[in-house]
Amino acid sequence: DPFVTEKSQIEIEKAVRNMGYMRAKVHLNTETKKNKLKVNYLIEAGQPYTVKHIAYNIDDMVINDYIEKDSANSYLHEGMPFDVSVLDNERNRITKLLQNNGYYKFNKDFLVYQADTVKNTFQVNLTMKLLPFQLRKEDVPTRHKQYTIRNVNFLTQDNLFLQGNSLEEYDSIHHEGLRIFYKDNLYLRPNVLADFNYIQPQKLYREQDVQNTYTSMGRLRALKYTNINFSEINQNDSTQLDANVLMTKGKNQSLSFEIEGTNSAGDLGAAASMTFQHRNVFKGSETFT
């Protein structure tokens, strides 16, 4: 297929150039032998471009300070190949750094590069720029907000918000800074939820805390799954978030029946083995067998 062949040629050339070989060319050579077509792609890489100088244009003193203090972990350094994948890894690294320091709405698209080639050389001067926060094109650009957690709410009914119910309609317990809302029966002890939670009230939002909570809650066998979302207190000017941990209860009981082959004193027979499990008998998500 000539279209597929040409498309592959373009993709290979693009990949090689993204590795820093900016003047690379890919030549196509085809051979027909015994009704079979053999395609060879010949890469003329040329000399790779390297980064001569790195600069940062970060028009936010707080964010600039975070980047500078963590510069020892940067993937960028002068003399490195001008490799697009490394540049993207650096954007991901800084994004993760900021998301773990309160920047709940930050993503890597707010970081862009400007690369200027140095005349008569195979070098580029690289500048990383920070774009202002802008959710939609028609929005006025603003500074990036640093969010703190106001409340951490544990909700034992995962469809509570979907039904349009108010939190006031549910029983609640306050435990170690957490607000636990339930109806009819609280099937997990408050201290268990506190022990498995990493999101802390009055602290900066940290994406790692969210992931750690997902991992930790996933070990509670009393739960089928957990969903965590965040709501802004005031979308216009607030920098506070409420964390909502929505829990879906798993089935408490299971019954399994196994047939085991036995061979005692030369007699081949069968023995029945029955196992009964209650996954939350003590409301601590224990398994009782």
Regions inferred by a protein language model and the residue ranges of each:
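Residue-level signature of outer-membrane beta-barrel architecture
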Residues: 278-280
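Periplasmic polypeptide-binding modules associated with outer-membrane biogenesis and secretion
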Residues: 1-263, 271, 275, 285
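Short, intrinsically disordered, charge-balanced linker/junction segments flanking boundaries
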Residues: 287-289
